[in-house]
UniProtKB/Swiss-Prot annotation:
Gene3D superfamilies: Deoxyhypusine synthase. The lineage of its organism: Bacteria, Pseudomonadati, Pseudomonadota, Alphaproteobacteria, Caulobacterales. This is Deoxyhypusine synthase-like protein. Its EC number is 2.5.-.-. It comes from Caulobacter vibrioides (strain ATCC 19089 / CIP 103742 / CB 15) (Caulobacter crescentus). Keywords: Transferase. Belongs to the deoxyhypusine synthase family.
Length: 367
C-alpha cells in the first residue's frame, strides 16, 4: 500500500503532467484519433439482451426497455419517435440514429440543436470528433482552439466553419419565419444537392425518408451563431431576415401526434426534447382534440430523480400529467453510449420493423 507521501507525490506528478507546456504542433497531435461510430448492423445484440433479461438491476431494466421498443415496432398502428439530448452523437452513436431512421424504426426526431447541428451536420461537412488521448490542461486546449466534451475533442475552427455554413443557408432562403423542422429540412436538402462531404448523416437521411426533425431549442447550438449573424447583417442593411418560430415547432409536432394516434418514445437523455415531445398530448387536448397518452416509452438517463428536474423525472411521474401511459414504460439509469447500441442492435436484428409502413410525417407540411 502506498504511503500518504507517495500518494501525494504521485498526485503532484499527475498535476505537473496535466499542466506541462504543449509544443506548437500539439494541436495536430491531439486531433489524431477519430471517434468511430458504432454500426448496429455489424453485430447481433440479441444474445446479450436475452442474457440480461435473466439478470437484475440495470441489466434487466435494459432488456425490458428493449422488449418495449420491439413491442412498439411490432404495433403497426404505432408511430415511434426518437427523443435525443446529450452528446451521444459525438460519442459514437451518430450512425445508430441514422440507421434507425433509414430502416423505418423511427418516424420523427425531437433533439437538441447541438445533437443535430454541432455534431451530425458538423460531420456531414466532412469534419470529425476526436478521442482525447489523455489529460491535458483545458486552458492549453483553449489556446489551441480545441473544445472538449468529457473525453472527446472538437476543432473550434471547424465548428466556426459549421456556423458560417448555417449563415450561408440562411442567406439563400426566403426571409420569413421557419419552424426548426422546416429549416432542418432545408439543411437536409442542401446536403442532398451535392454539398455533403460525408454521406449518410442523420439530417440527410431524415430528409430523404420524410422524417421530420424538431429542435425546440434550436438556437442553443451552432445554428444560433449563424442565425444571429444573419439577422444582425440584415438589420444593418435594413432588409427582412429569417427567424425560427418556436411556436410553429410545438404546433407541428402536435399535428404529428394527432395524425399518428398511437405513439412510442425512445428517449436518450431528457431536458427540452423530452418535455416537448411529452407535452404534445396536453397541447392536443387544449386544441380540443382527444389524443392518447404516449403508449410506449423508454428513457435512458443518468439524471438523479431527487433533483425534481424534467430530465430525471420518471415516466410514471409523467403519467400524473397525462402524458405517458404506465403500461409499457421503462427507465434505464445508465450512461447512454453503453446501452443505446445494445437496444438498437437488438431491435434491428429482431426485425419487428420489417413491413412497417413509413408514415413520412413531413408530408403533413408539404415536404
Amino acid at each position: 500500500m502506498k504511503s500518504l507521501f507517495q500518494r501525494r507525490a504521485s498526485k503532484v506528478r499527475e498535476t505537473e503532467a496535466m499542466n506541462a507546456p504543449v509544443p506548437n504542433n500539439q494541436k495536430a497531435e491531439l486531433l489524431q484519433k477519430v471517434v468511430e461510430h458504432v454500426d448496429i448492423t455489424s453485430y447481433d445484440a440479441r444474445p446479450i439482451i436475452d442474457s440480461m433479461r435473466k439478470m437484475s438491476f440495470s441489466s434487466r431494466d435494459t432488456a425490458r426497455a428493449a422488449d418495449i421498443f420491439n413491442m412498439a415496432l411490432a404495433d403497426k398502428g404505432c408511430s415511434t419517435w426518437l427523443i435525443l439530448a446529450g452528446s451521444t452523437s459525438a460519442g459514437g452513436c451518430m450512425h445508430v440514429y441514422r440507421d434507425m431512421v433509414k430502416n423505418g424504426m423511427i418516424d420523427a426526431v425531437v433533439a437538441t440543436g447541438a445533437s443535430i447541428v454541432d455534431m451530425d451536420f458538423f460531420e456531414a461537412l466532412g469534419f470529425k470528433h476526436y478521442q482525447a488521448a489523455g489529460p491535458v490542461d483545458d486552458n492549453v486546449l483553449r489556446d489551441n482552439y480545441i473544445d472538449r466534451i468529457y473525453d472527446t475533442y472538437i476543432d473550434e475552427e471547424e465548428l466556426q466553419a459549421c456556423d458560417h455554413t448555417i449563415l450561408e443557408i440562411c442567406n439563400k432562403l426566403e426571409p420569413r419565419g421557419y419552424s426548426s423542422r422546416e429549416f432542418i429540412w432545408e439543411m437536409g436538402k442542401w446536403l442532398a444537392e451535392g454539398n455533403a462531404k460525408k454521406e449518410g448523416s442523420l439530417i440527410q437521411t431524415a430528409y430523404e425518408e420524410g422524417v421530420p426533425i424538431f429542435c425546440p431549442a434550436f438556437v442553443d447550438s451552432s445554428a444560433g451563431f449563424g442565425l444571429v449573424k444573419h439577422q444582425k447583417e440584415k438589420i444593418a442593411e435594413k432588409k427582412p431576415y429569417l427567424m425560427i418560430d418556436a411556436v410553429a415547432d410545438f404546433r407541428e409536432l402536435t399535428d404529428v401526434k394527432i395524425a399518428a394516434g398511437t405513439t412510442g418514445l425512445f428517449m436518450v437523455g431528457g431536458g427540452v426534447p423530452k418535455n416537448f415531445a411529452q407535452d404534445t398530448v396536453v397541447c392536443a387536448e387544449i386544441l380540443g382534440v382527444e389524443a392518447d397518452m404516449h403508449k410506449y416509452a423508454i428513457q435512458i438517463t443518468v439524471a438523479d430523480v431527487r433533483d425534481g428536474a424534467c430530465s430525471s423525472s420518471t415516466l410514471k411521474e409523467a403519467a400524473s400529467w397525462g402524458k405517458v401511459s404506465t403500461t409499457y414504460e421503462q427507465m434505464v439509469f445508465a450512461e447512454a453510449t453503453t446501452v443505446v447500441p445494445l437496444i438498437a442492435s437488438d431491435a434491428y436484428w429482431r426485425k419487428a420493423w420489417e413491413g412497417r409502413e413509413k408514415p413520412r410525417w413531413n408530408k403533413l407540411f408539404g415536404k
